[in-house]
Amino acid sequence: MSLSSSRIRLLDSATVNQIAAGEVIENAASVVKELIENALDAGADEISIETLGGGKGQIVVRDNGIGMDADEVAVAIQRHATSKISHFADIFSLASFGFRGEALPAIASISKMEIHTAKVNGLGSKTLIEKGEPVCCEACPRQPGTTISVNSLFYNVPMRQSFQKSPQMDRLAIRRLLENSILSTEGIKWTWISERRQELNIAKNQGFTERVALVMGEAFVNEAFLIDKRQNELHLTGFLGSPSMHRSTRQGQRLFINNRAVESSFISRKVAEAYAWMLPAQRYPAFVLKLSVPPMWCDFNVHPQKTEVRLLQEGQIGALLVEAISEVLLHRSPSLEEKMVEPTMESPLIENGGLEIPSIRPVAISTPLSCPNFLQQSFVETEANRALCKEQENLALPIIERVRFLASLGKVILVEDSEGVHALFVQAARKHLFYISLLSKRSDSLLACQMFLVPPTVQMTKLEADFLQTRLESLAAQGIELCRISPDSFAIESAPPFIQEEELKEWIISLAHEGAFQVNESFEQLVENTVQKLAFSKNTRAFDHSWINVLWQIGKPEKAFDGETIRRLVLEEDFM
């Protein structure tokens, strides 16, 4: 635009609505959110959603709320038309979801919309809207309630369309949104049909516990701790995840303030503070918490999508959270004495930074390297595995370089080759072996995977399971064979031998969890990041001595893929 033509002018209504749509409507899930909130505000107790193409093709939301007259529809598609407030001060005592009156006109401006609605004893009407303007309106009977169909989302804003994610990512976003709605409301029937297949069907009489089990998984509910604490005007209720079910991100946290799904870094920090002494570093608790506060204490008008919240009286709210959660965890968790891990030796532990070895007493003498024995109860010995074992036995004293086990000492294993004595750091070595076995894609017999005799099962949320289902072929190529046995669980049929069963389950959950939300990350990067974050055991009993030979065969690396020290020579300076 030239300077001569840059006159100040009023924007036309179509442009204004499309700009508003850019703030309110981020993707198909944003449309679903606005429409179901309108249905809830209309008093509906039965809401059904249908989506095609992840929502970009079609979104249909039906409800049995109070409905509208034809003249109300004409007003509803205009900006700032709302039945929720009449003055600005009303915002601070809201009990409804929507109140700006921007959503419906914003959606209508970037889609082809149809509104079919009727009030009790009303005639009913059907209105067609394109580019935010009504095209036609006709009488059309129906039961009381409203059906809004949104077709060809973003059809007239190609730039916005080009920035949209895949239909699969949109479906995952819609699922999380609907799961939050299921958790935040009771006595409401929810149905979701995606790509003509029913994904959710929640009855009115399904209680909060059943709904949490559906969303978070039965394993979460079975191990979670109930919390119910009242303090003056505050009420905290919900489920606290067992400390053993910690996650690598905060995405396992569901928070509802006054029945609205929100994100609050303040509340997340306070919950983490209560869990702090029970979780490893950089791990986060999972929870489903409902907090009721006086309406004037919270401002949901921070973000156009109303997912962020500002809170007054943070001191009082924070104190309640820490006190109530700490009390539950202390009474329900094992004592500290029970959780203590006894050291394997009296000698001081060896850290990566230096060696402190007052006396070295070998706890086992080197024996011919053999197949991993600590997994023999779980893995079935196949012909391929027997061949691998034989091969490893033959390679126990390789022509290139001999290596033998000397001793286990704290978190390290001491081994000897022609170069001298090496300190082998168990945690880093196992993590590196597991990671490169995934990269090898079964091409290297030294890193071959093994089948489970009795496949263990891993349970997660339905959202995470749906993501994992899309990556089964990629995982199988890496030696992780999974079979979906229920909507929220998988059986693990094979895996590399370098990871223990519980670690493997934790990694698969972390992979599914982060994959469902880190939509901009490649699968290869996702695998690397989740392996890097995984807390492998430092116990030397988790490291089979045959793996020493494997490490030497692949070049006895000094550093793992993430830069962590795998081994280093024991020098005279270490004893001085």
Curated annotation (Swiss-Prot):
GO biological process: mismatch repair
Residue ranges the record marks as coiled coil: none
InterPro entries named among the record's database cross-references: DNA_mismatch_repair_CS, DNA_mismatch_repair_MutL, DNA_mismatch_S5_2-like, HATPase_C_sf, MutL/Mlh/PMS, MutL/Mlh/Pms-like, MutL_C, MutL_C_regsub
Protein name in UniProt: DNA mismatch repair protein MutL
Keywords carried by this UniProt record: DNA damage, DNA repair
Family of this protein: Belongs to the DNA mismatch repair MutL/HexB family.
Gene (UniProt): mutL
Function, in words: This protein is involved in the repair of mismatches in DNA. It is required for dam-dependent methyl-directed DNA mismatch repair. May act as a 'molecular matchmaker', a protein that promotes the formation of a stable complex between two or more DNA-binding proteins in an ATP-dependent manner without itself being part of a final effector complex.
Superkingdom of the source species: Bacteria
Zinc in keyword set: no
Natural source organism: Chlamydia muridarum (strain MoPn / Nigg)
PROSITE patterns in the record: DNA_MISMATCH_REPAIR_1
GO MF, one example: ATP binding
Entry's Gene Ontology cellular component terms: mismatch repair complex
